[in-house]
Amino acid sequence: GVNAVGKTTILDAIRYCLTTNRNFNALGNKKSGRTLQGSVHAKQRGENAYRRPGHTVAYIGAEFWDSVKHTSFVIAVRVESEGPMQELHPGDQTWYISEDGITLEQLPFIDPRTGAPSAKEDFKPAEGRLSYTRSPSEARDRICRALGIGRAASPLGKKFNEVFQMGTSMDE
């Protein structure tokens, strides 16, 4: 596809949601300097300017279909940041896994009254539940189990998390 339209940003976001890995743009040019903070605050390419320079919240979600149970479920992450130069702390990131039967459309990523990202306490489906954790290592473990991989520390869990680190750049 055309350069600079967001393909790698989407891949980075999905990878972060599913693996908790904050090393962005591993799939492209490792010298790009892209970061989670830069993506959350919409850093302008090649400039030190941000479209969202102040406090901001970003959600990333992925919906899965369980072919054995014949139902969907969602894995999502919420990142809250005070500013692009502030270091993220563990409490600034929350990973969610829905119970069976929940779809992306059932989660209020956006507050319908304000058009802004939903507050943490409002991020829940009208029916059903979400489990959550702020610990990246616990999130990795829960995500691997939800995907049927087993524990993140198992050989298959380690392989799953490694596969997302593989680069696809022509320069490598």
Model feature map: region roles:
Residues 33-153:
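Nucleotide-state sensing region of NTPase/ATPase domains
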Residues 1-37:
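Phosphate-binding glycine-rich loops of NTP-binding sites
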Residues 4, 55-56, 159-160:
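Short, well-ordered loop/turn elements at secondary-structure boundaries
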Residues 147-157, 161-172:
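Extended heptad-repeat soluble alpha-helical coiled-coil rod/stalk domains used for dimerization
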